[in-house]
């Protein structure tokens, strides 16, 4: 948190607002550190300018600056304003408390620092290894996908919910449990107010499973001889949690009611209002997790780095390794997470019938947006499998060959991405190369799961 405080104090952010010093004539000044990206026009010329306009509007919920007419900025535009909805958007609090410049630094720096900490703690609950949890946190939070999109609230709030649920369950103090339940209700509102179902829906499945894992472990603890180490769940705890959730739901309903006209207009649009996805278009970008690491320096092969930015997840190594580890160890948590991964992959590569897409809410998810949740889950599965293999084989085993395997995998992944971009019309050749990559991953899994 010291890093975040220093970044705010020195007004350091990841915004590309420095592009305006290039575009506006006679305007001097260059960024102190980093390169402004013209590709991030939706950030520096839309989102950030919304926040800047609000600083000249007294942070009122109705803007007289945007569009040159009265505009409700609470719900659709997601701008900072003195409104109930801002209670569920903590990233915007810096603008209201410190002004635009410090608020911009707060929105970038505090979010990233918290994301690193929360990702580490959440991964440790599942992986049970501090070094691997730290690796997970770094690979996730500093991935091309997070850095290019400048987002990540969905994993920040979702993982924080899992941690707070764990804290509420595995505690011996009633006041700690009450505080955790209040925070859970608030974070549920934060998650809903992200207003981006393309990521909210698949990540909901992931974090819901993690929450179920914690509940099952808590029940097992109560039944064991170690039951006195935790506080038993009581009926009063249920009432407190339901009461907090009802308050949060009431505030959310009030926020929607205040912006009902704007929401109705959005829902009546072709996009995103009439979106209905059934999947099946394929997701070859999953195999190109290596080369996006270098798009920050040069990207001559693509026109939009953001759309194919991924997480360094070693796909499909995690899925294959988890299946092999399950065969050997019968770890039910591992197989449940793998089943969810296969659920996403079936939607991406095969597709769902319309009724199944509607029932599962996956109709809100374009296939390309599955890069984020699939990459997240793949990285988690991979590191869980590594930890399971290390436990079964000992510290000095064939797991030592893993760095070499990963380096070769990264080279193959980069070659596949370049080959795919340069030879789009050679479908058969691409499929053969893809098969070679998958066979390599299978061989890699066998080398440390056998």
Walk through the language-model features, giving the residues of each.
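Membrane-interface helix-loop-helix junctions at transmembrane boundaries of multi-pass membrane enzymes
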Residues: 321-351
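Membrane-interface junctions at the ends of membrane-embedded or membrane-associated helices
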Residues: 168-180, 214-229, 356, 382-405, ...
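Aromatic-rich transmembrane-lumenal/periplasmic boundary elements in polytopic membrane proteins
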Residues: 2-73, 233-291
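Membrane-embedded helix bundles of polyisoprenyl
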Residues: 113-125, 129-219, 233-257, 407-414
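Membrane-helix boundary/interfacial segments in multi-pass membrane proteins
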Residues: 102, 106, 144-152, 342-399, ...
């Amino acid at each position: 948190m010291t890093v975040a405080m220093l970044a705010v104090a020195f007004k350091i952010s990841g915004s590309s607002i420095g592009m305006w010093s290039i575009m506006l004539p006679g305007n001097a000044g260059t960024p102190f550190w980093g390169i402004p990206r013209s590709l991030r026009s939706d950030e520096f010329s839309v989102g950030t300018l919304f926040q800047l306009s609000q600083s000249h509007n007294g942070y009122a919920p109705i803007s007289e600056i945007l569009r040159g007419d009265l505009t409700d900025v609470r719900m659709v535009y997601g701008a900072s304003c003195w409104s109930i909805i801002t209670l569920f958007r903590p990233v915007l609090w810096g603008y209201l408390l410190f002004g635009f410049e410090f608020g911009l630094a707060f929105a970038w720096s505090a979010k990233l620092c918290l994301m690193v900490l929360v990702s580490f703690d959440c991964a440790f609950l599942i992986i049970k290894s501090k070094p691997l949890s730290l690796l997970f946190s770094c690979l996730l939070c500093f991935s091309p996908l997070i850095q290019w999109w400048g987002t990540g609230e969905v994993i920040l709030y979702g993982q924080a919910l899992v941690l707070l649920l764990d804290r509420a369950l595995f505690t011996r103090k009633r006041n700690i449990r009450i505080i955790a339940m209040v925070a859970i209700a608030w974070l549920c509102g934060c998650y809903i107010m992200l207003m981006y179902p393309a990521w909210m829906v698949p990540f909901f499945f992931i974090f819901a499973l993690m929450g179920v894992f914690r509940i099952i472990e808590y029940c097992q603890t109560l039944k064991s001889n170690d039951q006195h180490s935790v506080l038993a769940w009581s009926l009063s705890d249920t009432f407190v949690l339901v009461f907090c959730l009802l308050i949060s739901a009431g505030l959310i309903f009030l926020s929607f009611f205040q912006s009902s006209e704007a929401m109705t207009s959005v829902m009546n649009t072709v996009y995103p209002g009439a979106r209905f996805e059934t999947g099946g278009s394929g997701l070859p970008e999953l195999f190109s997790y290596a080369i996006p690491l270098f798009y920050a320096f040069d990207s001559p092969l693509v026109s939009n780095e953001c759309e194919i930015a991924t997480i360094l997840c070693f796909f499909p190594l995690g899925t294959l390794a988890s299946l092999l580890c399950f065969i050997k160890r019968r770890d039910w948590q591992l197989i449940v997470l793998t089943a969810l991964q296969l659920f996403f992959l079936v939607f991406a590569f095969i597709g769902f019938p319309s009724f199944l897409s509607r029932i599962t809410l996956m109709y809100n998810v374009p296939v390309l947006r599955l890069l984020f949740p699939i990459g997240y889950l793949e990285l988690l599965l991979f590191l869980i499998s590594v930890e399971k293999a290390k436990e079964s084989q000992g510290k000095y085993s064939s797991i030592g060959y893993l760095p070499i395997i990963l380096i070769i995998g990264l080279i193959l992944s980069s070659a596949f991405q370049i080959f795919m971009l340069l030879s789009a019309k050679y479908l058969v050749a691409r499929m053969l190369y893809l098969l070679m990559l998958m066979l390599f991953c299978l061989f890699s899994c066998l080398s440390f799961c056998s």
